[in-house]
């Protein structure tokens, strides 16, 4: 049985960095981002990959069901039994579809949804300070923040009702955040 942790957080919360460090430090943990999974599926040349490519190549959004199937396929084929996925779900629709698919199978168990919590001010400082790409400007940041915040309460309430929502304070050093996240994951795997 694969044990899954979803890592969510605002743009600039450090969720991707935290998950990467944890997976790099532990050979028994695999870390994926949704975008990487879709690109890998396309690269594999599978039927699912061809379907995904038909949307991406035209600049269209990949349909919800296809994204969820891609994630589930990757989880089942993951090289380890413990998996971290960051930045998912991004919408209530994604969450509900993912939940439905997870409940209809027995190979993957959602152990926890870990929210790396930072204030909007800290997120803004980090994103606009890192200048990682063309999308790291104030206007784009504000839009990404809005897209993140709009469904957040509904997403966290849904997982809180399932007793799997956990919050980690993301406004500390990477070392402190990673240590807390590692401890939480280890506790939940017991």
From Swiss-Prot:
Taxonomic classification: Bacteria, Pseudomonadati, Campylobacterota, Epsilonproteobacteria, Campylobacterales
Catalytic activity: AMP + ATP = 2 ADP
EC number(s) stated in the UniProt entry for this protein: 2.7.4.3
CDD domains with a match to the protein in the record: ADK
Keywords tagged on the record: ATP-binding, Cytoplasm, Kinase, Nucleotide biosynthesis, Nucleotide-binding, Transferase
Residues annotated as binding ATP: 12-17, 130, 172
Residue ranges of the region described as NMP: 33-62
Compartments in which it is found: Cytoplasm
Family: Belongs to the adenylate kinase family.
Region LID, residue ranges: 129-135
Species name: Campylobacter lari (strain RM2100 / D67 / ATCC BAA-1060)
Job of this protein: Catalyzes the reversible transfer of the terminal phosphate group between ATP and AMP. Plays an important role in cellular energy homeostasis and in adenine nucleotide metabolism.
Coiled-coil stretches: none
Record protein name field: Adenylate kinase
Top-level taxonomic group: Bacteria
GO MF entry, a single one: adenylate kinase activity
Domain comment quoted from the record: Consists of three domains, a large central CORE domain and two small peripheral domains, NMPbind and LID, which undergo movements during catalysis. The LID domain closes over the site of phosphoryl transfer upon ATP binding. Assembling and dissambling the active center during each catalytic cycle provides an effective means to prevent ATP hydrolysis.
Enzyme class, first EC level, given as a word: transferase
């Amino acid at each position: 049985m694969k044990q899954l942790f979803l890592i969510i957080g605002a743009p600039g919360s450090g969720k991707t960095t935290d998950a990467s460090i944890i997976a790099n430090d532990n050979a028994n943990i695999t870390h994926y981002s949704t975008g990487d999974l879709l690109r890998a599926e396309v690269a594999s040349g599978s039927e699912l990959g061809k379907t995904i490519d038909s949307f991406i190549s035209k600049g269209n959004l990949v349909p919800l069901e296809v994204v969820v199937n891609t994630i589930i396929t990757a989880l089942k084929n993951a090289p380890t039994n413990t998996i971290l996925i960051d930045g998912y779900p991004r919408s209530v629709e994604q969450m509900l579809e993912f939940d439905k698919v997870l409940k209809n199978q027995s190979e993957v168990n959602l152990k926890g949804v870990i929210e790396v919590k930072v204030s909007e001010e800290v997120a803004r400082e980090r994103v606009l300070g890192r200048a990682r790409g063309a999308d790291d400007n104030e206007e784009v940041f504000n839009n990404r923040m809005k897209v993140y915040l709009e469904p957040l309460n509904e997403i966290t309430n849904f997982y809180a009702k399932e007793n799997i929502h956990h919050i980690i304070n993301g406004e500390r050093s990477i070392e402190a955040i990673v240590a807390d996240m590692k401890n939480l994951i280890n506790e939940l795997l017991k």
